[in-house]
Amino acid sequence: MAKSSADDEELRRACEAAIEGTKQSIVMSIRVAKSRGVWGKSGKLGRQMAKPRVLALSVKSKGPRKKAFLRVMKYSSGGVLEPAKMYKLKHLSKVEVITNDPSGCTFTLGFDNLRSQSVAPPQWTMRNTDDRNRLLVCILNICKDVLGRLPKVVGIDIVEMALWAKDNTPVVTTQRSTEDGEPVAESVTESDLKVTVEKELVSQAEEEDMEALLGTYVMGIGEAEAFSERLKRELQALEAANVHAILESEPLVDEVLNGLEAATNIVDDMDEWLGIFNIKLRHMREDIESIETRNNKLEMQSVNNKALIEELDKVIERLRVPSEYAASLTGGSFDEADMLQNIEACEWLAKALRGLEVPNLDPIYANMRAVKEKRAELEKLKATFVRRASEFLRNYFASLVDFMVSDKSYFSQRGQLKRPDHADLRYKCRTYARLLQHLKGLDKNCLGPLRKAYCSSLNLLLRREAREFANELRASTKVSRNPTVWLEGSTGSSQNANTDTSAVSDAYAKMLTIFIPLLVDESSFFAHFMCFEVPALAPPGGAGNDKKSQSNNDDGNDDDDLGIMDIDETDKKPGKNSPDLTALNESLQDLLDGIQEDFYAVVDWAYKIDPLRCISMHGITERYLSGQKADAAGFVRLLLGDLESRVSMQFSRFVDEACHQIERNERNVRQMGVLPYIPRFAALATRMEQYIQGQSRDLVDQAYTKFVSIMFVTLEKIAQQDPKYADILLLENYAAFQNSLYDLANVVPTLAKFYHQASEAYEQACTRHISMIIYYQFERLFQFAKKIEDFMYTITPEEIPFQLGLSKVELRKMLKSSLSGVDKSIAAMYKKLQKNLASEELLPSLWDKCKKEFLDKYESFVQLVAKVYPSENVPGVTEMRGLLASM
């Protein structure tokens, strides 16, 4: 027999080399063939060809514990073994010998930790059954020794495996050296080489029991086949004896069958009787159910009748109209003493109408004739009450206002300004505030005529109060008029310019202080009294009022707390997009329309006395306008906006007239010196700055811009009428403008801008005038220098002396005529500068500018001569500067 690969030491060493460094030792290594196919009926391999592999069993000691592994080795391209896969034997769950292989040399190993159980495990085919048994016995011994358990074995008898292991344990001869170096042979079993397998597959006790059993049959432990045949023969004998015993008991069986047939007949009879009883019971149950159904219907009908009677009682109670409420709604009085009863009747009527509407009333009742008739009756009551209440309130509003208008003590009189007091009027109206709330709930359309009646009546009162107050306010304000002609050419027009006219703006402020809060209060009262759904208003005496308005408040103002929230504490506050807002603004237009004429009259009166007071009035109006934020004060905002426009229009009229006064200077005869409107504008600007209040700065700055623009344009036009003296006129007037506005320009940005503009124009006029004077006295000198400069652009300085008119001789002639008696020429230049100058205070600064300009031009001339005529002597700049300084 060929030697097994399990005994191949070279193979073992190759496996140890392949797992070197893993601290594992090889127990057994053996060559196998790996395949994935199955053995068919023909005995040939299936899908894949077998691949040569080596299975190696290894163990690893870690303290007292041991771990066992099954390694699969494959051959590399160079024929060297290398690890392919490794399985832990602790996961080995099944060892199955393939029955389709007739040789019995193919088996599979099942592991319970493989990821894909759907893939068939590889099949391992050994060379012969001895190699197969040798490998499997080694695996089972290691599992039992190391793991303490055996995997499931399928396809082979484990007893046969144990018997094979006992008979085929190989003896391996090893050599060891003695002390003298001679080898000595020693015999050990394979199981003693690496792992001690003292625990066998079948225990000693089991083997002794098996020998005792076989001994009873006078057989040895190795005669298993004979023992099996003997057991089969005994089993067949026992089965034959059982059949014989059954045949002997046939009479007994017949007797039992007869008894069973009699019992079956009795059972059939009982079943028939039970069927009869069941039919009778079913009929009885049907009768009982019929009786119960009729009884239940009667009970339900009784309950329904009772509930129906209760519901009808409720409906009748709901449809009943109390006599006291019917009397109040159809013919009751609207006196103050009876208002509580009227309110209760209104509340009952509104509740009754809501109760007959579908959401609050069952839809079944809504179509009943009695309900329809009662609803029609309630609608008739509602229409009657709304008509009576509306007629009463219209007459009541008219009578209240007529009473107040007929009493002159309510209005301002000669020598006595009276603040309008509507506390009593509002108190009387508040008596009917809740009535209006209920009228709105009953019929919204009835409020339109009531609002118009209230607005019409109260408008008469407000216009009368404003007219009387404005007339007395103008009559009681004593102040002399300021001139409206500020910038005219006449000298006497500004003599009264400093008259104190503050009483005018105070009167206007007083008019606003008294009437703007009154109009806001009236708007607020009207919005809530007439049930407009708008947001709450600011309280009276808001942002637009000053201390003076607070000091004028008398005790009657305590009644201005109208108690609007007391009308209906559950009144909601809708947003600013309320649909009532448009209707409210239209009603406020009717309420307050026409009162603006009296405010316009005060503005026009103030303008006639002092146009500049428009500045103060503009600031006062702007302050009140910024304080009106509430929606119900919409008309008051419009009124203040119109007043602001009126004030701005009057002030613009004043500005336009003043501009026309400035432009009229242009048509005068030749003018010299400072024009009269220059210093007068400074006085006007000073006065305007004193009147600025609040947001009036933009208005004043616009006026400044228009004034100064016209002034500068007119000045330029006047100067162009006489070009000979134009620069003198310009520099004198621009200097006067700067001098008169120096202080204001430091604090007013708009005037500062024009101040810098005038400064630039002054410098330009000075430069032109001084250049003219210098050229007048030294014309030949600087014309000669101009010719030299012109030639220097085209030829070299050395060639210039050879040009016509620029020779050295010509230079000497020119110097002699221009610089001989230069002191006289300079004195003449000073006299000419002084001759036409009306403002003597400008002469020193102009003369300094003139000397500086002359020295600069002369220095340029000397430098040109030094370049072109280096050998010629010219008086130096230092000499000329000394001469100018001595004069």
Curated annotation (Swiss-Prot):
A cellular component term, taken from the record's GO annotations: extracellular exosome
Principal localisation: cytoplasm
Coiled coil: 221-248, 281-301
Disruption phenotype: Embryonic lethality.
Compartment list: Cytoplasm, Cytosol; Cell membrane; Cytoplasm, Cytoskeleton, Phragmoplast; Secreted, Extracellular exosome
UniProt entry tagged with the keyword Repressor: no
Its membrane topology: Peripheral membrane protein
Expression sites (tissue/organ): Widely expressed. Preferentially expressed in tissues containing dividing and expanding cells, such as the shoot apical meristem, root tip, lateral root primordia and developing embryos.
Keywords tagged on the record: Cell membrane, Coiled coil, Cytoplasm, Cytoskeleton, Exocytosis, Membrane, Secreted, Transport
SMART domains per the UniProt record, alphabetical: Sec3-PIP2_bind
Skewed-composition ranges (Acidic residues): 555-569
GO biological process, one term: exocytosis
Region (Disordered): 542-581
Keyword ATP-binding: no
Domain of life: Eukaryota
InterPro entries the UniProt entry points to: Sec3-PIP2_bind, Sec3_C, Sec3_CC
Function: Component of the exocyst complex involved in the docking of exocytic vesicles with fusion sites on the plasma membrane during regulated or polarized secretion. Involved in polarized cell growth and organ morphogenesis. During cytokinesis, involved in cell plate initiation, cell plate maturation and formation of new primary cell wall. During cytokinesis, involved in cell plate initiation, cell plate maturation and formation of new primary cell wall.
Subunit structure: The exocyst complex is composed of SEC3, SEC5, SEC6, SEC8, SEC10, EXO70A1 and EXO84B. Interacts with EXO70A1, SEC5A and ICR1, but not with ICR2. Binds to EXO70H1. Binds directly to B1L.
Family: Belongs to the SEC3 family.
Protein name (database record): Exocyst complex component SEC3A
Source organism (scientific name): Arabidopsis thaliana
